[in-house]
């Protein structure tokens, strides 16, 4: 029988149909949907916040203050008192505002305490936000830094010679113990420490003061100083360290060290300036470029009521506080 030629198109169609039929393969079973799995919903909690709203500087009660938590609001009365009930299942945003005051922003825990007394910062009454941000927030660019526990003040009884300085000569990076430091050095350190309660709203009153004597020839390095975390140490330094130099290095809640040169160790105002650095004060543009005179500058340094007022507020707010009055992430006000 003569062969029959099928057109190529027909052969291709037959091949496609055979493939589509699957050649007798078993069908794939549909994927089973899990049963019995339920998404848990957090249980809502009801919390009634109560308290009094006052001026952080004068202590006067604030009428008409608006407290807002998670969309719910309450207003303080003539006596500054407020009450606000919230029902929610998680941490809620919090704010407290009033005419003539900076708005306080934080968070509320639905399982926290129910009494929250609020101290708002006035736009006035001796508070200067520009100065506060300059002193404590790198001109408003960063959060504050302050001690959250009592530091230990450690006075070194030896004179230290500086064997090596940093590139600009302003800081000693290698020290060696010599003989006894002048008596007036320890006296001035103790006198400056005694003022720290005034500069921190009494937060750092009563911090322990110790002395440390190093064996002659002991060598120490910058950013270690042989001290423990939580220590503010003081040294009388000669050698390569500038006679007119004084400086504090380190960070609150870690360790801080202060050096005093041969021409400045007897100057009480310089001691106060450096200890103010140790508790959180700064001069980001240098001591001769301050918004107004005070303990940070310009020279000659002046201890002012503004320093005391703003230092107290620094320690009434959590470390990391942002301008104008925003608690750092994770802060719970109750």
Describe the predicted segments one by one.
Residues 178, 182-289:
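Metzincin-family zinc-dependent endopeptidase catalytic domain
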Residues 60-63, 68-85:
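Short, acidic Ser/Thr/Gly-rich low-complexity loop/linker segments typical of extracellular
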Residues 252-266, 282-334:
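Metalloprotease/metallohydrolase-associated module, dominated by Zn2+-dependent proteases
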Residues 51, 76-87, 114-118:
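Glycine-centered loop-to-beta-strand initiation motif
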Residues 17-20:
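C-terminal motif of bacterial Sec signal peptides marking the signal peptidase cleavage site
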Residues 90-100:
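A short, solvent-exposed beta-strand micro-motif common in secreted/extracellular proteins
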Residues 41-64:
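Structural motif
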Residues 28, 32, 36, 99-107, ...:
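Disordered inhibitory propeptide/activation segment of secreted metzincin zinc metalloprotease zymogens
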């Amino acid at each position: 029988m003569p062969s029959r030629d099928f057109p190529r198109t027909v052969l291709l169609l037959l091949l496609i149909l055979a493939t589509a039929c699957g050649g007798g393969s078993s069908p794939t079973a549909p994927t089973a949907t899990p049963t019995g799995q339920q998404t848990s919903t957090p249980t809502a909690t009801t919390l009634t916040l109560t308290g009094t709203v006052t001026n952080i500087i004068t202590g006067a009660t604030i009428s008409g203050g608006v407290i807002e938590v998670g969309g719910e609001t309450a207003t303080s009365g003539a006596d500054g008192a407020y009450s606000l009930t919230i029902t929610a299942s998680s941490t809620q945003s919090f704010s407290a505002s009033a005419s003539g005051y900076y708005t306080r922003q934080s968070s509320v825990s639905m399982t926290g305490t129910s009494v929250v007394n609020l101290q708002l910062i006035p736009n006035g009454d001796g508070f200067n936000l520009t100065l506060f941000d300059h002193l404590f927030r790198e001109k408003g660019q960063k959060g504050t830094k302050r001690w959250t526990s009592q530091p230990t003040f450690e006075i070194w009884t030896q004179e230290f010679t500086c064997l090596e300085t940093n590139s600009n000569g302003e800081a000693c990076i290698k020290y060696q113990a010599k003989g006894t430091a002048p008596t007036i050095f320890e006296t001035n350190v103790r006198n400056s420490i005694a003022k720290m309660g005034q500069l921190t709203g009494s937060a750092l009153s009563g911090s322990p003061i110790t002395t440390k004597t190093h064996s002659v020839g002991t060598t120490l390095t910058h950013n270690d100083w042989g001290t423990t975390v939580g220590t503010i140490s003081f040294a009388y330094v000669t050698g390569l360290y500038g006679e007119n130099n004084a400086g504090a290095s380190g960070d609150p809640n870690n360790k801080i060290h202060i050096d005093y040169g041969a021409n400045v160790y007897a100057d009480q105002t310089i001691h106060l300036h450096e200890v103010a650095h140790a508790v959180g004060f700064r001069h980001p543009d240098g001591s001769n470029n301050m918004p107004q005179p005070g303990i940070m500058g310009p020279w000659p340094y002046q201890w002012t009521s503004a320093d005391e007022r703003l230092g107290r507020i620094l320690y009434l707010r959590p470390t990391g506080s942002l301008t104008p009055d925003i608690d750092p992430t994770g802060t719970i006000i109750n």
